[in-house]
């Protein structure tokens, strides 16, 4: 990761920040990843997760809108989601 000075960041903190996650359809996909998100944003509301199944129903897309408080928080959350075995893509 590159160190970007706060004055050069395109994100102002704190702010609401959407993170999109895709993975294969699994009964516990949304719940499992919500638990990961809660580790980085304890105030996250699980009822706010947006879910979109793929056209064929094999994949599920989730959008988590987290309260971003720092670049470090977002970077750590992205790493945790990207490294999770149920996750295919994080945007």
From Swiss-Prot:
<dbReference type="InterPro" id="IPR027471">
    <property type="entry name" value="YbeD-like_sf"/>
</dbReference>
<dbReference type="Pfam" id="PF04359">
    <property type="entry name" value="DUF493"/>
</dbReference>
<protein>
    <recommendedName>
        <fullName>UPF0250 protein BP0104</fullName>
    </recommendedName>
</protein>
<dbReference type="InterPro" id="IPR007454">
    <property type="entry name" value="UPF0250_YbeD-like"/>
</dbReference>
<comment type="similarity">
    <text>Belongs to the UPF0250 family.</text>
</comment>
